[in-house]
Amino acid sequence: MDHRPGLDPSVAEVRRAVRSALERADGPVAVALSGGPDSLALAAATAFEAARAGIRAEAVVIDHGLQEGSDAVAAAAAEKARALGLGARVVRVEVGSTDGPEAAARAARYAGLAAAAVEIGADVVLLGHTLDDQAETVLLGLARGSGGLSLAGMPAERRDATGPIWVRPLLAVRRHTTVAACAAQGLDPWNDPHNADPAYSRVRVRNRVMPVLETELGPGVAEALARTAEQLREDAEAFQDMIDETIEDIVEHAEAGISISVAALAANPAAVRNRIVRYVVDSEFGVSLSRAQTLEIARLATDWKGQGPIDLPGCLARRVGARIEVVARTAS
């Protein structure tokens, strides 16, 4: 335990969280650094704990190029990492325009981090999301009418099929703790102006909605939302195991897509049926179905009245005899 005389409690809390995360590292680790208080506190704790454990750690600063002077901000963040004893690199990424600005920036950021991790030889990338970020994610999901999987928030650990392990050591740590940890160590974090821009829904939740909830419902709302996410994630993971087993039995590959047994799909409870539809379409085509689209496809099995093909982004769903086919639109 970090209870040495003079060690600030906030610094100790962040270090404990990082120490636990580093236990799963078999080699070098990368730490995502924006220069803000969350990622800077994470970088400082990683520098300390990695040195103690004999683990090489390197900070990766992503320059999205979306703000004037972003290159200088990125360079300053990298210099702070080096001052902490970390290796550091700046990765400039190109943000696409096909999705919304937040989604496009996120996709570019993760791609840049994954590529840097390969160059570093790191199987683990540490991310600085806090308990507050988790609570905001749950609230945003509720406002959008999302399903249980979205309300489960961000996982503490996730591995892509071909990428690194994404680890969020600070999901049980409050944002005010990372701010205090930076102050206690004399670190000067960068304050991203986007984090104060009410044009972003997450900023409105953070600065307007959460304070009202804390005032009206009492303290502990953020912690309660984070607990809800954790419980839903446990349920979702168990549910996904059921879905995987069912899919093996009822889903087959078809030309330019997949096909699903009508009888087997209809025999499942609605929750399982709808999850199967969403999951197989997302897995095959990368399309995230709305609830209305999901139900419309399911009705091809449960309420068949000769409906025509259902247009979806990049693909279409249709009833063909005793099966539902979801195929690329060019194959129709």
What are these regions (language model features)?
Residues 107, 133, 199-203, 207, ...:
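An alpha-helix initiation/capping motif
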Residues 130, 179-181, 185-230, 234, ...:
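Mid-to-C-terminal catalytic subdomains of enzymes
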Residues 15, 26, 253-331:
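Mid-to-C-terminal catalytic/tRNA-binding core of tRNA(Ile)-lysidine synthase
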Residues 145, 176, 215-219, 271, ...:
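Residues at alpha-helix boundaries and the short loops/turns that link adjacent helices
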Residues 213-242, 260-276, 280-281:
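An accessory alpha-helical subdomain
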Residues 1-207, 211:
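Core alpha/beta nucleotide-donor-binding catalytic domains of modification enzymes
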Residues 244-254:
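Conserved Class I S-adenosyl-L-methionine
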Residues 150, 164-168, 322-332:
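Short, well-ordered strand-loop elements centered on a beta-strand within folded domains, enriched
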